[in-house]
């Protein structure tokens, strides 16, 4: 970009905190009438965000489970494919984020955290460990590499503070013809808001 469009970004202005730890599970057998969406809460939701701000894996995370009853997502009627997500600190291998993240490439960390999430699910009444055929673990480091999101922070900048939602980059940039879309831009992260971000940019660009 031309230098006049490049604005220095300081840690106190743009802070990324939360990424996601994802488990993709292949399970034998079928769950009787599974809920498509399940949210398994820990004992204290507030402490989850204390851990994230401190840059450490959440001790007692909320676990989101998607168990779609969709024939297109499983090989046959005797198997299931689940998506599991917990909040996780952003990937920060060199401590460049001021201690606000974790080195998710550290040997053994991803698999250990995946085991812990499965144990938490079991403790909260959703034990699938004996049914597990295969799993893939995706960490904030993988998300950073795959999506180029800073630290794998899939929700963009921190949402702390009453004004945080208004500090996200606008969809129309100062550079003519350059538009911003996705979880790091207005209005924010998560599939519904990312879809809305795309709609806003579509309307800004106008018909071809």
Q: Model features per residue range: what roles?
A:
Residues 28, 68, 87-89, 137:
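Histidine- and/or cysteine-centered catalytic micro-motif in compact active-site loops
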Residues 30-31, 56-58, 102-142:
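Flavin-binding catalytic cores
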Residues 1-4, 11, 20-31, 79, ...:
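C-terminal structured subdomain/cap of oxidoreductase catalytic cores
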Residues 88-104:
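Amphipathic alpha-helix from the class-I
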Residues 33-38, 75-78, 93-98, 190-193:
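Short conserved micro-motifs at the rims of enzyme active sites and ligand-binding pockets
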Residues 1-76:
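Mid-domain catalytic core of redox enzymes
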Residues 60-64, 123, 127-187:
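A glycine-rich dinucleotide-binding beta-alpha-beta segment and adjacent secondary-structure elements
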């Amino acid at each position: 970009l031309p230098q006049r469009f490049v604005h220095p970004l300081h840690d106190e202005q743009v802070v990324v905190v939360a990424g996601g730890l994802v488990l993709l599970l292949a399970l034998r057998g079928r769950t009787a009438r599974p809920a498509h969406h399940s949210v398994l809460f820990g004992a204290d939701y507030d402490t989850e965000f204390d851990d994230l701000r401190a840059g450490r894996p959440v001790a007692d995370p909320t676990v989101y489970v998607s168990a779609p009853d969709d024939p297109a997502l499983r090989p046959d009627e005797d198997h299931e494919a689940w998506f599991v997500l917990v909040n996780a600190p952003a990937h920060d291998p060199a401590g460049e984020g001021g201690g606000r993240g974790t080195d998710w490439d550290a040997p053994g960390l991803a698999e250990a955290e995946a085991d812990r999430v499965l144990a938490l699910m079991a403790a909260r009444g959703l034990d699938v460990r004996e049914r597990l055929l295969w799993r893939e673990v995706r960490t904030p480091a993988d998300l950073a590499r795959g999506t180029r999101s800073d630290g794998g922070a899939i929700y963009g900048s921190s949402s702390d503070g009453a004004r945080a939602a208004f500090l996200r980059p606008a969809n129309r940039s100062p550079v003519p013809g350059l538009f911003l879309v996705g979880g790091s831009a207005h209005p924010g992260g998560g599939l519904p808001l990312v879809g809305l971000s795309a709609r806003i940019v579509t309307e800004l660009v106008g018909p071809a």
